[in-house]
Amino acid sequence: MKLRNAEKRLLIAVSQIIENEGFSKIGVNKIAKQAKCDKVLIYRYFSGLEGLLAAWAKDNDFYTLAYQAYSERVTKAESSEDIIKLTQTVLLKQLNFLRTNKLMQELLAWELSGNSTFRSIQNERERNGFKLQEELEKKLGKESKDVRMFITILIASINYIVLTTRQYRIFNGIDFSNPEAWELCKQTIYNRALFENILK
């Protein structure tokens, strides 16, 4: 279904406010003013602020986008080798997406601050991320806590490194202001030996 012009403006307004002022400034009145819309439209089209943010997340949250992009590729994978390569691809995409996407950085930082009352975005991310995980496990023919925890640690590590190095360039003795550090990070994700004992 095509979005109405007002719906598009409201979604764009959310992005603009987050990018320019931070997630803490999000509110119905501010969004409506930024979008040049009556705030009643937020309730009419999205059932309120939570619904608007959930809709926004579908276009801006990595794992919501990743599920749409990769779920079919998981089901078509023919071997554990394919699964390893696909898992590495998704993790590398996550790294690149988060490094270059200020909106996603602001969202995660706000959630981690403990001040976020907007559960809809996190719930949407968890739902889509876990569906992708379930499809991966189904393809491997097993439900493995080791697989799930392994991927969870990698996802969390990527998030934490990117967010931490926004403020502090050195982490565990590695200078992340140096492009070589990020290349090494990518090479580590592509390290076959790291994955094959868990995913095979």
Q: Could you say what each language-model-derived stretch is?
A:
Residues 9, 17-56:
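Helix-turn-helix
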Residues 68-100, 144-151:
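Hydrophobic alpha-helical connector segments
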Residues 5-13:
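N-terminal positioning helix adjacent to the helix-turn-helix/winged-helix DNA-binding module
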Residues 65-69, 107-141, 148-149:
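Amphipathic alpha-helical packing segments from all-alpha helical-bundle domains
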Residues 95-119, 165-170:
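Amphipathic alpha-helical segments used for helix-helix packing
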Residues 136-189:
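Hydrophobic/aromatic-rich alpha-helical bundle segments in the mid-to-C-terminal region
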Residues 9, 89, 107, 149-156:
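Amphipathic alpha-helical interaction segments
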Residues 53-60, 121-122:
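Alpha-helical DNA-contacting segments of helix-turn-helix folds
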